[in-house]
Structure formats: structure tokens, C-alpha cells
Curated annotation (Swiss-Prot):
Alphabetical list of HAMAP family matching this protein: Ribosomal_uL15
Entries under PANTHER family matching the protein: 50S RIBOSOMAL PROTEIN L15, LARGE RIBOSOMAL SUBUNIT PROTEIN UL15M
Biased composition (Gly residues): 21-31
GO cellular component, one term: cytosolic large ribosomal subunit
Keywords: Ribonucleoprotein, Ribosomal protein, RNA-binding, rRNA-binding
Protein name in the entry: Large ribosomal subunit protein uL15
Organism taxonomic ancestry: Bacteria, Pseudomonadati, Pseudomonadota, Betaproteobacteria, Burkholderiales
Native source organism of the sequence: Paraburkholderia xenovorans (strain LB400)
NCBIfam families to which the protein is assigned, alphabetical: rplO_bact
Amino acid sequence: MELNNLKPAEGAKHAKRRVGRGIGSGLGKTAGRGHKGQKSRSGGFHKVGFEGGQMPLQRRLPKRGFTSLTKEFVGEVRLSDLEKLPVDEIDLLALKQAGLVGELIKSAKIIATGELKRKVVVKGLGATKGARAAIEAAGGSFAE
């Protein structure tokens, strides 16, 4: 057995359906599409979601929610990230310099994930109730 002699098993491959190539093929003239009507024409098919004139599902259901335009400008920082910062006074600029938030971020919020064991002073940043409690328990404070 050599690679150049390999062939698929007998009957494993089917010939491609050649439609519209004479009546002897069984698929001549109308090519299996029947007579007339939208489905027999080229390009003749309804759009996705079309329900025959009935009000389509995506228009029957109400609109919900919205996309916040400010979401991409607000950053989140974990307590465990603050633990790694070399500075004791933490503000937005310090977070940007450490690479914890992106350059386009305009405000940030500290969330209570991980733990903080050292004293830090947080300036101009928001914090969740749990994060605020953890920072104050570690001897830290908030300066607005």
C-alpha cells in the first residue's frame, strides 16, 4: 500500500447532483424546483425571520435595556491589586501608572475581592461597602 494508490471504498463517494442538464438525468428542465412561484426563481427566498406577513417575533417583543455609553470609561480595581501597589497614597493616576486601569478610564471603583493587609490612603476613588470596610479595618482611610 502506497499513498499514491489510496482510494476511497467503493460506494463511499457520491457524484455531485448536476441539475438542469437534460431530461434523462431526472433533474432536467425545472431542476427539482417544481413550476413557477418564488421558490423556483433565482434569488427567490424570504428574508430571515419573515413570517409570511405576520408581525415577526423580534418586533412583537418589547425592547429592553440599553447600552451604557460611560461603561468603557469606568474601571474596577480589586483589593488584592491595591496590596501589590508600591505606593501608600492611591488615586486614579497611581492606578494608571501601575497599569491596573486603562489610559481612557475617567473614574474607578474599588471592589472587595481579595484582601488588604496594609494601610493605604484612597483619594478620589469610589469603593463598595465591603471594600470600604476592609480598607478601614486595615488602618486605611478615604480622602475626597
